[in-house]
Amino acid sequence: MAVNTQPIIRLTNVTKSYGEHQVLKNINLDLEAGKFYTLLGPSGCGKTTILRTIAGFTDATSGQVYFDGQVINTLPANQRQVNTVFQDYALFPHMNVAENVAFGLKLHKVPKDEIETRVQKALAMVQLADLGEREISEISGGQQQRVAIARALVMQPKVLLLDEPLSALDAKLRKDMQYELRDLQQRLGITFLFVTHDQEEALAMSDEIFVMNAGEILQGGSPVDIYDEPINHFVANFIGESNIIPGKMLKDFEVEFVGKQFECADAGMQPNEAVEVVLRPEDLDIVAANQGKLVVTVDSQLFRGNYFEIVAYDTDHNEWLVHSTNPAAEGEPIGLTFDPQDIHVMRLNESEAAFDARLEQYEDD
């Protein structure tokens, strides 16, 4: 029996322009059924426009949008098997919780007894089974967010689109809701497409992340792949904190930066090719200055609760960010040490296709 590998959502060469301003630039995107995807990027990068294009609220200027293999560019939003949870939830204050959840079903003239059954089931999914009669003004922000999700799920979509739904919540509730959303997606087994500018949310919840900037998808992959193997300077800086240092790839598995040669885990580049070297702050260990692979001088530090964030400089005036469980004195020279696999080498201006091909080539060797 053949396995259906066709993506549930596919965008092919999709662009969107407003006059001369191009919001989306040749977007190609495949979403498989049953996974949690995140579009991650700064404000104005085009991530919400992609969401609206899939939902049918925005028309693509060019390119094709597919759902289960069928082009849906001209299909009205209310006929698409997707539902959207908006940033402001868009709940009706004059309706109670159950009435809000039932609203879409009533518009579609679903029989009353079926409405009651589906509303109760949807509320139970989001742990609000006992709050159906509550007014919207009587429930918390986190509960309002769950009502908005229940209202979308009650329509039994194949894809749920979520447009920064956690942004209005406080830090603790936002973290709690990350767990709840991930658990809900896994229990339901439907496709979630989540939009956020918060890299912590993306890393915590996603099966796959697409990092965007200026209307383009720069890199897609698992959270671990995106974090450990960023394709370029923007991705490395946007996904977590990074030390990014100019360097030179001497040969496979050997790189030079700050005037020294180091063993690394990268290959597939030209001898003496100019590169950028990434070292994450948490991968740097502090040792005595005479024992370090690098020597830096501490400039400042902040206590972050479970670690000290130390800013230091080397003799070439490169800034180094270090996360350590031990404090360091300002003005003190310290040694930094790290393992070869902690070094990530990035080519300048490498496309995602070329990046993926290079990784596959040297990982297979």
Curated annotation (Swiss-Prot):
SUPFAM superfamilies: MOP-like, P-loop containing nucleoside triphosphate hydrolases. Its main location: membrane. Residues 9-239 form the ABC transporter domain. It is a peripheral membrane protein. One of its GO terms (cellular component) is ATP-binding cassette (ABC) transporter complex. GO terms for molecular function: ABC-type putrescine transporter activity; ATP binding; ATP hydrolysis activity. ATP binds at residues 41-48. Its EC number is 7.6.2.11. It comes from the Bacteria. It is an enzyme of class 7 (translocase). Part of the ABC transporter complex PotABCD involved in spermidine/putrescine import. Responsible for energy coupling to the transport system. Belongs to the ABC transporter superfamily. Spermidine/putrescine importer (TC 3.A.1.11.1) family. The complex is composed of two ATP-binding proteins (PotA), two transmembrane proteins (PotB and PotC) and a solute-binding protein (PotD). This is Spermidine/putrescine import ATP-binding protein PotA. It comes from Lactiplantibacillus plantarum (strain ATCC BAA-793 / NCIMB 8826 / WCFS1) (Lactobacillus plantarum). The gene is potA.
